Swiss-Prot record:
It comes from the Bacteria. NCBIfam families: phoU_full. Plays a role in the regulation of phosphate uptake. This is Phosphate-specific transport system accessory protein PhoU homolog. It is found in: Cytoplasm. Its main location: cytoplasm. GO terms for biological process: intracellular phosphate ion homeostasis; negative regulation of phosphate metabolic process; negative regulation of phosphate transmembrane transport; phosphate ion transport. The lineage of its organism: Bacteria, Pseudomonadati, Pseudomonadota, Alphaproteobacteria, Caulobacterales. Keywords: Cytoplasm, Phosphate transport, Transport.
Length: 230
């Protein structure tokens, strides 16, 4: 392989990483905005989140196309192959995070028409901030190839589950105490579930980073809490 070809190959891999990083920044913004839309009962911001999901879909398709092209034409091996596959898999997780943010945006639009439920909204906001932080940490780990940071995100997955379980119980209490809150509480329950799924995708990305950097799977069982089993 000539020096020019090697340089071009390296640039293609770097460009793929940069595109995933850019997509991650957009996904972070979408998640932050959907949380803010819930907290502030901000209809226009919620609508912007719903409309903005298309950018992530487009970027994911571009990254997928470029990753497949690189694999087909360059036939990378070992660590280079892991880099390309990681970019592809992470872009897919980010696209799903965008879908979750879009779903939350749609719920936020409905909730702006409902009576305010300040205590529950604050609980959702706290969970949202936690999930937002997890997503930021794991994307920073990807950008900087920080293995320990990725493992840290993976090992703290249980915290998001604890928040979800607490909100689940809180919402049940509200609905049993006042049936008039059932409609709004149901939407908030879906919001919390979408946030939990974003947290799961952050954990999945941490696992992808671990394999990308080490060539080994994270073998320990991921910590997980399930309110329905308790």
């Amino acid at each position: 392989m000539t020096e020019h070809t090697v340089k071009s190959y390296g640039e293609e891999l770097a460009h793929l990483t940069a595109e995933v990083t850019r997509m991650g920044g957009i996904a972070e913004s979408q998640v932050a905005d959907c949380i803010a839309a819930i907290a502030r009962r901000d209809g226009p911001l919620a609508q912007a989140v719903v409309a903005g999901d298309e950018r992530l879909d487009t970027l994911q398709s571009e990254i997928e196309r470029k990753a497949f092209r690189l694999i087909a034409l360059r036939q990378p091996m070992a660590v280079d192959l892991r880099h390309a596959v990681a970019a592809l898999k992470i872009s897919m997780s980010l696209e799903r995070c965008g879908d979750m943010a879009k779903n939350i945006g749609k719920r936020a639009l409905i909730l702006t028409e409902a009576d305010p439920m300040s205590a529950l909204t604050r609980s959702i906001e706290r969970m949202g901030k936690l999930v937002q932080g997890r997503l930021k940490d794991v994307l920073d780990a990807y950008t900087t190839s920080d293995l320990q940071r990725a493992i840290g995100v993976w090992s703290r997955d249980e915290e998001v589950d604890e928040h979800y379980n607490a909100i689940f119980r809180e919402l049940l209490t509200y609905m049993m105490g006042d049936p008039r809150t059932i409609n709004a509480c149901t939407h908030l329950l879906f919001v919390a579930k979408n946030l939990e799924r974003i947290g799961d995708h952050a954990t999945n990305i941490a696992e992808i980073i671990h394999f990308e950097l080490t060539g080994e799977e994270l073998t320990s069982q991921r910590p997980k809490l399930d309110v329905l089993s308790q």
